[in-house]
Every structure is written in structure tokens, then in C-alpha cells.
Amino acid sequence: MDFLSITGGEKLQGSVSVSGAKNAALPLISATLLAKNEACLKNLPDVVDIKTLLSLLEMLGAKVQRIDPHTVKVNSSEILSTKATYDIVRKMRASILVLGPLLSRFGKCEVSLPGGCAIGARPVDLHLKAMEKMGAIVEIKGGYIVANAPKGLKGATIAFDKITVTGTENVVMAAALAKGVTKILNAAQEPEVVQLCEVLQAAGVEIKGIGSNELEIVGQEGEALEFKEVEVIPDRIEAGTYLCAGAMTNSSIRLERVVPEHLSAVTQKLEEIGFGIEYGENHLTLLPASKRRAFEIITTEYPGFPTDMQAQFMALATQCEGASIIEERLFENRFMHVSELQRLGAGIHLRGNTATVNGGTKLLCADVMATDLRASSALVLAALAAEGTTNIHRIYHLDRGYERLEEKLRALGAVIERGRE
């Protein structure tokens, strides 16, 4: 099993190119199950989760041609199976995204209950209720979601009790081939959802309200789609993580290949802390702060502050003057990085879903263990500012979502090596 060894205290400088967004690529790969032609996806991040989902599609019978590490062609015209088995799905919760397209196109599917990051309950009930509303018969049998719609799915009004990104994406894909009009109320507005809608729209599906919390999809009545070539949007969470790396070490770094408006919640918070930000059309530059001030964060749905940046900003809070308050409203059990940050010397007090971080802390090296994808990135950030050499274990979590992390950080001047234990 690999680990990262990081010697802290080095200033960072230079530029880093942001990879394609994993959370945009996963629904787009799933959506190729709706295509009658060969679909070409570009700017895919070269990370484990993408490889896992492509392997799942191959298991279903899709032909996957890997042109290069960031480009694939997927042909789903001859799917042999509609069963997504446990041995693949257990590795990644996002595998649930094949539910909507399989059910919509083939009228049946079996999807193992998903795995992935252990960060609390993310019930798939919202997905299942939506499919039932669209006419599917859904049961849980032997750890599998078994769904059947022998007469096809029909349009319906889906009002989500709470905003769900993957739930919105699943319903959008299911609605694409359904009969009639589907309305989604309280829809997620994330850029990744927007890109999925735009790709389906380019493939011939009429969708109104893209980017809003109310979507209207006119189904194609079972007619498979003609996909155009797709370039995956840049990863706003990876971009935010590198901005935090610069902020942790109070350095100046430049990000290439970003969409600045996708990062507004993050960049506004960094400016509030005291950093300067120079904005370009598709690039950003972080400028050092004369003083790093404490801050408050409440995680919420886009366009609010993203839960996927909560752990990174908790690491940053250790280097700010005063007490920062971080409230996690989206997921339970998403403070598993706290105990590991405390091993490095962070002063963090937890009460329910709120963490108080006493800043100005001198972090000292230690052996720490990654518990999930974003928590592991917080440990990397903390190690960049810690005195001495920190070893981060179980970094397979990082490899699920960050492409060539150590190479990119090393290019910025970080002292970081990957080892095997």
C-alpha cells in the first residue's frame, strides 16, 4: 500500500494545470449508456474512480476504447447485461449513476447498493422514490436495487425533499428517454449537473431551466441519443485544493484551466481571509496575505460553500489568526480528519456538526492516516505547513480523486515523495 512522505515548511511557486472534473466525468460516462453512437469523452481525469466506472461499463458489455489517459470512446450499442455487480460498485458510490440510464433505456436493471467514501449516510432512497414515481417497480433484494419498468419510464414531477446531486443526475438521465415530460423541483445546480444537461441537450433532449433549481426534460420515448464529442469541465474541487496549498504556505501560485465562476465561494472566502486573487478568463493567481484572518464557513449546496472543500479549509484554519468556525450541514460523520489533524498539533474542538479551530498553531510532523478522499487532501495540506516530515498512509483515497497529486505539488516546490509499505 502506498504512502506519501511530505517535508513541510517550503514556499510554493509556479503554476499548476487543473484536471477534468471527476464529479462531471462520472455522470457523463454513465450517460453514454443512453447513446446509440460511439461517444467520445475528452479531458477525463486519470484517476481510479474513472477507471472503475469504465470497467463497470465494460462489464455491462460496452466497448471502451482508451485513446490516451484523458480520452475515451464508449460504444453502448450492444449492452449484454444490466446488472452492476457488487465487486465493482462496492468501490465507489457514484456507480449508482448507472441506475437511471440503464432503467430508462433497457427497462430493467440491478445495481448493487453502493460503496465508496465512508462519510456517513447517503441514502439512495431519493433516487429510488423518483424511479418509482416514473413508473418503475423497485425492490431491494440481497444487497441489490432491482428495478423494472417493462413499459418504459414515464414523465413525472419529482420534488426532492433535499437537494441531491447524484439524485438529480440520475433523474435527468432517466427522463431523457422517458415518455412525456419530467419536472424536477429542488434540483441540484452544481456545474457538473449543468454540463450533464448541456450534453444531453446537444444530443437532442429538450431541457429547460438548466442551471436553476427547476428542470423540465422532454423525454425521447425510448429513442437512444446521438452524442456529440464532450470535453469535461475543469475540476473546481481540485482547483480549490491547490489554492489552499498556496494559502497554507502563504505562497503565490497560478492555476491554469479553471472556470473562475465555479470557484466563487472558495475564492471569496480566501479574499475574506486576506489573500489576493487575480482573475483571468480561464486562470487564477493566488497572492500571499499580509495577515491570515480567522473565518466562518457553513457548507451548503452550490453556489454556496462546497462540502468537498470543508476539510481543506479546516487545515487552513490552523494557520489563521484567531478561532475559525466550520459548520457541516450536508453530511454526517464528515469530520473524520479532525483526529488526524490533531495528531499534527491542530487545536480543534468538535460539538455536533460544528468545529472550532484555534488558529496560529505550529504543526509538527507525525504519521497520519487518510480516511476518505477530501480528508486525505486536508492532511496533505497540513503536512505542507508542518515542521519535519509527515507520512500519510492509506492514500488510495487520494488516488480516487486527484490526478498526479504529488507530481503537481512537487512542480510547485513541495518536498513530497510516494513510497510503498
UniProtKB/Swiss-Prot annotation:
CDD domains xrefs: UdpNAET
GO biological process, one term: cell division
Keyword Cell cycle tagged: yes
Active-site residues, as the UniProt record annotates them: C117
Top-level taxon in the UniProt lineage: Bacteria
Keywords per UniProt: Cell cycle, Cell division, Cell shape, Cell wall biogenesis/degradation, Cytoplasm, Peptidoglycan synthesis, Pyruvate, Transferase
The EC number(s) this enzyme carries: 2.5.1.7
Localization, UniProt: Cytoplasm
Pathway terms, separated by semicolons: Cell wall biogenesis; peptidoglycan biosynthesis
Entry keyword annotation includes Transmembrane helix: no
Positions annotated to bind phosphoenolpyruvate: K22, N23
InterPro entries: Enolpyruvate_Tfrase_dom, Enolpyruvate_Tfrase_sf, MurA_subfamily, RNA3'P_cycl/enolpyr_Trfase_a/b, UDP_GlcNAc_COvinyl_MurA
Chief site of localization: cytoplasm
Molecular functions (GO terms): UDP-N-acetylglucosamine 1-carboxyvinyltransferase activity
Modified residues (2-(S-cysteinyl)pyruvic acid O-phosphothioketal): C117
Catalysed reaction, written as an equation: phosphoenolpyruvate + UDP-N-acetyl-alpha-D-glucosamine = UDP-N-acetyl-3-O-(1-carboxyvinyl)-alpha-D-glucosamine + phosphate
GO CC entries: cytoplasm
Pfam families per UniProt: EPSP_synthase
Residues annotated as binding UDP-N-acetyl-alpha-D-glucosamine: R93, R122, P123, V124, D125, L126, D308, L330
PANTHER family: UDP-N-ACETYLGLUCOSAMINE 1-CARBOXYVINYLTRANSFERASE (PTHR43783:SF1)
Function (record text): Cell wall formation. Adds enolpyruvyl to UDP-N-acetylglucosamine.
Membership in a protein family: Belongs to the EPSP synthase family. MurA subfamily.
Record protein name field: UDP-N-acetylglucosamine 1-carboxyvinyltransferase
